[in-house]
Design a protein with these regions (language model features):
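Canonical positions in the second alpha-helix
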Residues: 13-14, 49-50, 85-86, 121-122, ...
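Alpha-helical linker/edge segments of TPR/alpha-solenoid repeat scaffolds
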Residues: 71, 107, 178, 209-229
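Structural signature of tandem alpha-helical TPR/SEL1-like repeats
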Residues: 2-10, 37-46, 73-82, 109-118, ...
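Short helix-capping/linker turns of helical repeat alpha-solenoids
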Residues: 3, 17-20, 32-34, 53-55, ...
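Eukaryotic tandem repeat interaction scaffolds
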Residues: 92-106, 112-142, 146-164
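TPR/TPR-like alpha-solenoid helical repeat scaffolds
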Residues: 168, 199-218
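Non-Sec secretion/translocation targeting segments of pathogen effectors
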Residues: 263-265
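Hydrophobic face of amphipathic alpha-helices that form TPR/SEL1-like repeat modules
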Residues: 25-32, 61-68, 97-104, 132-140, ...
Length: 265
């Protein structure tokens, strides 16, 4: 405890001198509320001061807090602004989150080219999550489709321990659709993914061994992929149905309330 009190005293002194890194550290400490009592107002003020002085870590921390809306009130516009500030200063986690937001297109308009740009910048810093998502986009999105970029991105992710990237590389070399089929390389990546706990890779290896040939394994893989897409589409349809049902119930309640208040005859 004495060590924490000493650290807080030092940070408070540095904050008085407008030290942006001290503002970031103290703001983050107040935001987390682990070693001291949480103070969201002080945390928000300190992180903002630090971010406006160009501290990429503070901009990311405050932006993420606004995005999540758990500790601070959600503020999407400010979250995106701060994450952009952090990402523009080269912070890979901010670049990844921005890329993911732009890819989902839920809180900001979807923009695949910007997605690829931010994810590439994060992947260049060996961020495995960004590299994996970049690989998926280059593999599936027509606007930026590029098999070589997909492989490059997946390899970065795989080299940094992403088993899904290893699995994707195994499938790419197994299919031999956009690159020459290479069963040795395919099995290398599939085994690597399976060793890292990827059940899809383990099932595919099992299918290859049971069927005794690659053609049957590929057919099995394609069937599984087709079934997965059917299930995904069905779940999406059910989700939309639930949302529409909720909307109808809400509209009905609003109409009933208006009628009760004499606003609608």
């Amino acid at each position: 405890m004495n060590g924490m009190l000493h650290a807080l005293h030092w940070l408070e002194s540095a904050v008085k001198d407008d030290n942006p890194y001290a503002e970031y550290l103290l703001g983050k400490t107040f935001l987390k509320g682990e070693d001291i009592e949480r103070d969201t107002e002080r945390a928000e003020s300190l992180l903002r001061r630090s971010a406006e002085q160009g501290n990429k870590y503070a901009a990311y921390t405050l932006g993420k807090a606004y995005l999540d809306g758990d500790v601070l009130a959600q503020n999407i516009d400010e979250a995106v602004r701060l994450l952009n500030l952090s990402a523009s200063k080269g912070f890979a986690p901010a670049q990844f989150i921005l890329g993911r937001l732009l890819y989902k297109g839920e809180v900001v308009p979807k923009d695949i080219k910007k997605v690829a740009e931010w994810l590439d910048r994060a992947a260049a810093q060996k961020n495995p999550y960004a590299a994996y998502l970049a690989g998926k986009i280059y593999l599936t999105e027509d606007e930026v489709k590029d098999i070589q970029k997909a492989i490059r991105s997946f390899k970065i992710a795989a080299e940094n321990g992403n088993d899904y990237a290893e699995y994707q590389l195994g499938k790419i070399y197994l299919y031999g659709k956009d690159v020459p089929r290479d069963t040795d390389t395919a099995m290398y990546y599939l085994q690597l993914a399976a060793e890292h706990g990827n059940q899809y890779a383990a099932q595919l290896i099992h299918s290859i061994r049971v069927n005794g040939n690659w053609t049957a394994a590929i057919a099995s893989l394609r069937l599984l992929g087709h079934m997965a897409r059917i299930i995904q589409n069905r779940l999406e349809d059910e989700r939309r149905g639930r949302e529409n049902s909720i909307d109808r119930k809400l509209r009905r309640k609003i109409e009933e309330k208006k009628q009760a208040q004499g606003l609608k005859q």
